[in-house]
Design a protein with these regions (language model features):
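Sequence signature of WD/YWTD-type beta-propeller architectures
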Residues: 4-181
Length: 181
């Protein structure tokens, strides 16, 4: 461990754990497009204090690590390279956790990389839980190849009794999303 963040390399000694890793979001055994943003995740292991993740595909390896916050953040450039080189193939994911008795290796899982890219943008309305009235509400656009999110339209940043209106969030112009991009 270097500073607060462990070094991203496979531990020299570890025990094989005959259990599946619990991650959030659950990205185990899924198919992803080759241009998707890095699939950062949290490892849920209440007694572990450090984590190392190894992605392996077609002669390439990508490593990521986390301390006791368990948040795995994947380098964007390395992620893009790994996915582009593995279109139509699987990438194996091995996760190691440092527990009080030493490192363990969870059962590996795979991520299949599709040949086809995903459309870059998704638009959606973002509303507060229990939404009943025209309050703070907006239509947003997210770039699925990055983490960039932009408002297309926001009703109100703050509640205003005299200035609330429908923003037509159920309909796109002439039923088409083409003009949203």
């Amino acid at each position: 461990v270097v500073g607060c963040k462990p070094k991203a390399e496979v531990p020299v000694q570890f025990a094989e754990a005959d259990i599946e890793v619990n991650i959030y979001p659950d990205y185990k055994d899924i198919v992803v497009p080759p241009n998707i943003a890095p699939l950062n995740f949290i490892v849920r292991d209440s007694i572990a204090t450090a984590y190392v993740v190894q992605f392996t595909g077609k002669g390439q390896e990508l490593f990521a690590a986390a301390a006791d916050d368990a948040v795995i953040r994947i380098d964007t450039a390395e992620w893009r390279s790994l996915l582009m080189e593995n279109k139509g193939n699987d990438v194996s994911v091995d996760i190691y956790a440092k527990r009080p008795n030493g490192w363990i290796h969870y059962k590996p899982y795979k991520i299949s990389i599709a040949e086809e890219p995903i459309d870059a943008f998704l638009s959606y309305r973002l509303i507060e839980p229990g939404y009943e009235l025209y309050r703070q509400l907006g239509i947003y656009q997210r770039n699925l190849t990055t983490f960039e999110e932009k408002p297309i339209y926001e009703n109100n940043r703050e509640y205003d009794d005299n200035n609330n209106q429908c923003i037509n969030c159920h309909n796109y112009r002439m039923g088409s999303t083409e003009s949203m991009l």
